[in-house]
Amino acid sequence: MIVVKRNGLKVEYNPEKINKFLEFVCDGLDASMSDIAMNSDLLIYDGITTDNINKALRDSAESLISENNPDYAIVAGRILMSDLRKKAYGDFTPDSFLSIIKENTYLGMYTEDLLANYTEEEIEYLDTLIDHDLDFNFSISGALEWEKKYLVQNRVTGTYFETPQISYMCVAMMYFLNEDKLYSKEERLQYVAKAYKYLSEGVWNIPTPHLARLRTPTRAFSSCVVIKTGDSIDSISAVDMAARRYATLGAGLGIHTGDLRGKLSPIRNGAAINTGALYHAQSIERAALSCSQGGFRKGSITFHWHGLHKDFLDTVSYKNSARPDADSMKHSDHAIWINGFILHKIRKNEDIYLFDPPEVPKLWKLFYSSKLSEFAKEYNRCVADPKINKVAVPSSRYIELLVAERIGTGRVYIGFADTLNEKSTYNEDKYPIFSSNLCMEIALPTADLEFKYDSTTEKYDVDGLIALCNLGGINWGAVSNPNEFYDIADVMMNAIDNLLSYQEHPFGAAKRHNSLFRPIGLGITGFAYWLAKNNLNYNNNYELTDYWMQTYSHAVIKASIELAKKRGPCEGWLDTKWAEGVLPLDIRKPALESIISHKEYYDWDEIRNEVKKYGVRNASMIALFPAETSAKISGSGTTNGIEPVRALIQSKGGKETVAKFTVPELIRLKDKYDIVWDWKNNEGYIKTVAVLQKYTDQAISANTYTNRKNFSNDKVPVTSIINELYLAYAYGLKTLYYNNNQDTMDTSLYNGDAQTKAEVVEPVASEEEEHCESCSL
């Protein structure tokens, strides 16, 4: 039998080479070489290429993954990583780090900044720290993410220019590119070494824009962009342009369209009639979808709508597949913003009145504030004013529509506008927060975009405030003691703050926001794994979660204060609650006491005094994002974000990266994992999120889960969902992200015979990675 090598040379098939290779990829693992070989024999044919042999071996190993044999996921990952080594270097042994940087810089794949800011001696020293063997710790799901998404490559020719450990060290170097201006070169190298260690050992999670781009000539690294549309053609056009540009840079978009006037509203005193917000939003949607997220996938948007908008009955169902294409926005997701007043109306079963934004400017402004009593007074005035047009909707119909669309599509999100501002770190009178981002974890001020002519450059720019957020995560499953957070957070906050100064901004509105607030969003991954390791679940973890999260918050805030001491606070810090010494834990909801009594483990008065004296470098610091993708490359893989697992083995990934994913330490912790479809309701999860939100200055991508089997006749009562809404609001959650429905999923688990199927994540959930290039990480 003939085998065709990569260079076209034809050689005789040699089973001994296969056996030697299998011996290597199975070394130290509970995996059978003979089983892999026997399976792959069926896939090997005369004239097969070496690439296809590797693919046959990989597929064979992956097919053997089961609850009793999870190590085959690592075997499959090793096979793919071995293949990538040869594709990148032409040989199994990597080239020297210095030669790789020089070659890739010459080819234009790496930025010249690496060689300009580090000496050859420094690069050679860092080469001694690189552990290439760590590439063989990735499971197949993580290895595929590297192959398709993270490695610097020519996507046209299929040429690879690096392997994961090279990527990690380059990223670490880029994080501290100019650190020698603040520290000695020796101290800078220490920071780089720590960053590489945390990255390569899976302690850090960093987002796709960082991991895929930070070493290339492209200087755009923000995961999240939040944009606000004003009620004018100029503003809509400015948002259209901004959406298009940021989609090409790989950022997920959250676009606030809640201020657009309603359908049939008068324009220019009745000279024209408005066609409604839908068509303007569709234009923005098409602009973003026409662009690729940095070469990985089409742009993605969540549109954010006002819950009292006169077109609410339409906007709530824009995602509904039953709507005609011309009258829908099925390729985007939608968030409906409500407040405590609306929830009160629903509870009292009173009509809810909807308004046209231009007619009720004061009501609209008060909606995005914590001033509920003033809002209620203005609402009642508007209802009583016969000159103001309004639409009365029975509250039962209002909530049934909202709940039906949330359950039916899984992708109608909910936000609480009053809590968003009440529990923020910003002065809401000067910098209100109107909406969130693509994945509902960002809570930053924005302002209407408008075109502005810059006489110095003789070009038009976009004025207003575009909120950007750079993310980073810490894998709690890889941390044995919460005191470790202090060093981990110090290095990560330094790294991302450096990046805020290094990245370029296509619009002045974004550059201004960055200068004002320098926002960062540190999150959590591996939470479900952490619970399992500690023999906890989502119903009994509150005390330990509170202690760890308080430590996490303390470490992150201290790191930002230290940065403020060294580099100065962000420009807008005096317009934040930080300047008053008010911390996130100080503005917690009273109802949290029913979950766990508040206990302060640290001297928070010291923090308050230091904040008032030195300020903070970053006005926002913590945001808990989904981390769906990056969790798979944390060592051999960990659980994503703060989410529960849906099965012990799942099929996860985007269109090109679907692979079997096993939970960490499956055999040892098999009976400890809290499987979401065993839950009767979301109450324990909501309480867990509430404890985390207590210390989170931004928001949390909090999902809910609906299992129809828990209800009679498989019908989910609206009251069940409403009660969870009330619970989430009472405990201080700011947003609700996906609603995951079990009835659209196959949640079969693997058993020992390796024959049953893995859980196939529902289209809604599998698109989660496809649509969220940014904060899925």
Where are these regions (language model features)?
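Catalytic alpha/beta core of large soluble enzyme barrels
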Residues: 122-146, 439-452, 496, 500-501, ...
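Internal maturation/activation junctions in enzymes
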Residues: 216, 489-511, 536-627, 700-701
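Function-dense linear segments that define catalytic or interfacial modules
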Residues: 152, 166-188, 192-269, 273, ...
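Conserved catalytic alpha/beta cores of large enzymes that bind or transform nucleotide phosphates
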Residues: 272-282, 289-396, 400, 404, ...
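Alpha-helix capping and helix-loop boundary segments enriched in small/acidic/polar residues
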Residues: 6-13, 159-162, 183-190, 210-216, ...
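Short acidic, low-complexity intrinsically disordered linear motifs used
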Residues: 763-777
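Terminal amphipathic helices with adjacent charged low-complexity linkers/tails
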Residues: 72-104, 338-339, 420-443, 448-450, ...
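Core nucleic-acid recognition elements
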Residues: 9, 31-173, 186-196
